[in-house]
Amino acid sequence: MKKSNMFKIEEMNLYKTTDRFLNNYKHLKKSLKRAPTLEEISDIDQLHYNGIEAVNEAILKTKIKENNIVLDIGSGIGGPARYLANKTNSIIYAVELQKSLNDIASELTHNYKLEKNIFHINADILKYNFNKIKFNNIVSWLALYHIPERSKLLKILYNLLEDKGYMYAEDFYLKKNITYDEKKLLAKNFHANHLVSLKTYKEELKN
């Protein structure tokens, strides 16, 4: 029997030096001689492609508005959550598995006085109990492919989403088949626990 491809998420090469995020923030603050705006900090705290443009797209497509309750999965150091909260005055539950990233997210959110809008949660989305909270919107940027047990994940998200709620996900999919060794390498370097074709991805969402 083949060993599992899954690796601890802390082993990801992307996140071996989390201190750099705060160091970059402090350097930017020093160079500006003031606290940077959320737009100015977006090159640092948006850990996905297209920065706040992608967040604006999610706001538009999922109709995020004031007082909406939003779930952000794999929230990183909290960039999208802070931008969402500041722009829409929505309430964000930002779930991040890695404690080091979640700690930085909490510190930056405190700096921008957005604690009333954002709840930073260091937890596994597959295990966390939301105590019957229902979400108007679920968003995620480059995080879902890290999470194994796709069927379980989608069932959880379906049950968390309000009727007529919206979900927005920026994610990876396979454009062609890859070998077992390639999958193993992606799992080790990028914690890629679920990579499928676009067709399969869409079928999973429908089911």
Language model regions located:
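Conserved alpha-helix/loop element of class I SAM-dependent methyltransferases that forms part
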Residues: 48-66
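Short alpha-helix
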Residues: 193-206
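Class I SAM-dependent methyltransferase SAM/SAH-binding core
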Residues: 69-73, 77-127
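A short acidic, Gly/Pro-enriched loop at the edge of an enzyme's catalytic core
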Residues: 128-138
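A short SAM/SAH-binding and catalytic strip from SAM-dependent methyltransferases
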Residues: 137-149
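N-terminal, positively charged/glycine-rich alpha-helical extensions of SAM-dependent methyltransferases
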Residues: 1-38
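Short, glycine-/aromatic-enriched active-site segment of Class I SAM-dependent methyltransferases
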Residues: 172-192
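A short glycine-rich, Lys/Arg-flanked "PGG" loop and its adjoining helix->strand segment in the class I
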Residues: 151-166
